[in-house]
């Protein structure tokens, strides 16, 4: 892997640099010297008109530079979710923590560059497009789809396969997102359909093609330990806190953005209660399952995303969150084993239960909201078409990507080396003391022996 991975990664970065040189430019007035005389005259006339309007006491629209700094805090929240939230959520496996958080950083850094180029060209009307704050937010959104899909194949793919999947998935995602927003004119502010459902079913399709019969009965490394679950819970908390920003980042300012924030806030809160209740209910001795708490508590943010900015009452948002928490826990308890043993789809992180089912439920909830007249920017048919497009393009794109990744040239690890950091990372030597400090056989306090 040494030379192949390095060569591919460096070559792709060169391609990114050249692409930015060819297609991307600053949005600010620093480009003024590159504009034609007519463009400069038009800009001066617009500036004079704005100045006259302000002198007359009229409220002028904020400058684009001001919008950049207004949205930058929301972008930072989304950025934290991508790099810290998703990263630590992937550290639950006892011997795959380095890869979970480390490859999350690598794929996100690659994905946001590629996503900027692909989405920018799709939405621009020329060969060059300005680099705005919304380009940065949408680039993070495109990266989120890859990280969701990454969860379905976590521990079973090589770094090179992850790179190939990132490039292909973002291209398919950008095409579907353009279709949903520009052609179908559907409403999906929090991206329940275009990000969560798409990312989940893309990942499941890839996992189905790459299915390993040798893992049908489990793997010794496919389990957590006390501290790995604790690290994963850190990711959950970051995601949970910043999810209102994720769902409101691209909403229209003021009323729509306000609704997106408060609806997500209450949906998440309601989701936590039902997730805890169901987790205790489905376990024989009534104990909580950390897998449910790490994941199902976030399902409310996923499900409410599509209709977050619609004029839905708060109780409707809370109902969406409550149902999403129930669906997610039941999915982890009953559906994941069924997918693995009957449909031959091994979903490492259970992305179908956190992103897939709640994403589909969110799309259906938006159809109900529109039928009640809670939105005038879309129709029931538009929403249904957008949901079908997101799932369909994800499955087809995932199957094609899986077939490409199945080629033997990508250094896919054999079964015995799955879920093991030592394949790709230098890891510390094993110490018996590591296990000693995390024993839970007795309730005796551990004495410090140094």
Curated annotation (Swiss-Prot):
Molecular functions per Gene Ontology: ammonium channel activity; ankyrin binding; carbon dioxide transmembrane transporter activity; leak channel activity; methylammonium transmembrane transporter activity
Q: Does the keyword Transmembrane helix apply?
A: yes
Residue numbers spanned by region Disordered: 34-61
BP terms from Gene Ontology:
ammonium homeostasis; ammonium transmembrane transport; carbon dioxide transmembrane transport; carbon dioxide transport; erythrocyte development; inorganic cation transmembrane transport; intracellular monoatomic ion homeostasis; methylammonium transmembrane transport
Where it mainly occurs, coarsely classed, is membrane
The record's account of how the chain is modified after translation: Glycosylated.
Q: Which residues cross the membrane?
A: 5-25, 73-93, 98-118, 135-155, 160-180, 190-210, 230-250, 261-281, 290-307, 312-332, 350-370, 385-405
User: Which Pfam families does the entry mention?
Assistant: Ammonium_transp
User: On the Cytoplasmic side, which residues?
Assistant: 1-4, 94-97, 156-159, 211-229, 282-289, 333-349, 406-450
What PANTHER family does the annotation carry?
A: AMMONIUM TRANSPORTER, AMMONIUM TRANSPORTER RH TYPE A
**Family classification:** Belongs to the ammonium transporter (TC 2.A.49) family. Rh subfamily.
Q: What is this protein called?
A: Ammonium transporter Rh type A
Organism whose genome encodes this protein: Rattus norvegicus (Rat)
Source species taxonomy:
Eukaryota, Metazoa, Chordata, Craniata, Vertebrata
Gene it is expressed from: Rhag
């Amino acid at each position: 892997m040494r030379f192949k991975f390095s060569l591919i990664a460096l070559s792709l970065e060169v391609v990114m640099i050249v692409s930015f040189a060819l297609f991307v430019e600053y949005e600010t007035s620093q480009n003024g010297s590159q504009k034609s005389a007519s463009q400069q005259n038009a800009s001066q006339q617009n500036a004079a008109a704005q100045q006259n309007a302000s002198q007359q006491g009229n409220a002028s629209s904020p400058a684009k530079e001001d919008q950049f700094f207004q949205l930058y805090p929301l972008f930072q929240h989304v950025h934290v979710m991508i790099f810290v939230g998703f990263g630590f959520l992937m550290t639950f496996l006892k011997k795959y923590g380095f890869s979970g958080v480390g490859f999350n950083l690598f794929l996100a850094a690659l994905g946001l560059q590629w996503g900027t180029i692909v989405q920018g060209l799709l939405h621009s009307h020329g060969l060059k497009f300005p680099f705005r704050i919304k380009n940065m937010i949408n680039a993070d959104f495109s990266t989120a789809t890859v990280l969701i899909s990454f969860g379905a194949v976590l521990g079973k793919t090589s770094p090179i396969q992850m790179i190939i999947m990132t490039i292909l998935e973002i291209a398919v995602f950008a095409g579907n997102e353009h279709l949903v927003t520009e052609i179908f004119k559907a409403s999906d502010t929090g991206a329940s359909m275009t990000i969560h459902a798409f990312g989940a079913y893309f990942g499941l399709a890839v996992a189905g093609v790459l299915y390993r019969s040798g893992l049908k009965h489990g793997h010794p490394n496919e389990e957590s330990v006390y501290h790995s679950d604790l690290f994963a819970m850190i990711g959950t908390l970051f995601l949970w806190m910043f999810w209102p920003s994720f769902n409101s980042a691209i909403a229209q300012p003021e009323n729509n953005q306000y609704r997106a924030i408060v609806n997500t806030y209450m949906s998440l809160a309601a989701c936590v209660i039902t997730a805890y209740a169901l987790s205790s209910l489905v376990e024989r001795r009534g104990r909580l399952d950390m897998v449910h708490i790490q994941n199902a508590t976030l399902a409310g943010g996923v499900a409410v995303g599509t209709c977050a900015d619609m004029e839905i009452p708060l109780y409707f948002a809370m109902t969406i969150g409550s149902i999403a928490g129930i669906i997610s826990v039941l999915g982890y308890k009953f559906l994941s084993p069924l997918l693995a043993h009957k449909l031959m789809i091994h979903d490492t992180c259970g992305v179908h239960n956190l992103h897939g089912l709640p994403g589909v439920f969110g799309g259906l909830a938006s159809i109900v909201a529109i039928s009640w007249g809670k939105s005038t920017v879309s129709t029931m048919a538009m929403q249904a078409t957008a949901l079908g497009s997101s799932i369909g393009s994800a499955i087809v794109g995932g199957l094609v990507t899986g077939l490409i990744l199945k080629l033997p040239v990508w250094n896919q690890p054999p079964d015995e080396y799955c879920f093991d950091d030592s394949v790709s990372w230098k890891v510390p030597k094993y110490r018996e003391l590591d296990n000693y400090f995390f024993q839970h056989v007795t309730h005796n306090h551990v004495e410090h022996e140094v």
